[in-house]
Amino acid sequence: MAEFSGYESHLSRQAAAFLIGRSRRQQCHVLDLADQIALHPFQISDYQTDDDDGHKVDNLLLGEFLFTYWVDHAVKEVRITEITKV
């Protein structure tokens, strides 16, 4: 049986724009990684930074991709604001 946390990943326009320029295979891989973050929403990120509005966001390196995100526990969503290939 597959794991399910009840959380869903959601991409910002900026994160979605990052995916558009990738191959179909890489798009699927990155989306799978985003779903892994949603599967474990309480995991500790690699580090935190402040976004443009001064809110704390988490940064997590998964493979060759750095995900910047915040978790909205009230609605069980992981809001991915930026994805960067490192």
Where do the protein language model's features map onto the residues?
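Basic, Lys/Arg-enriched alpha-helical interface segments
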Residues: 1-66, 70-86
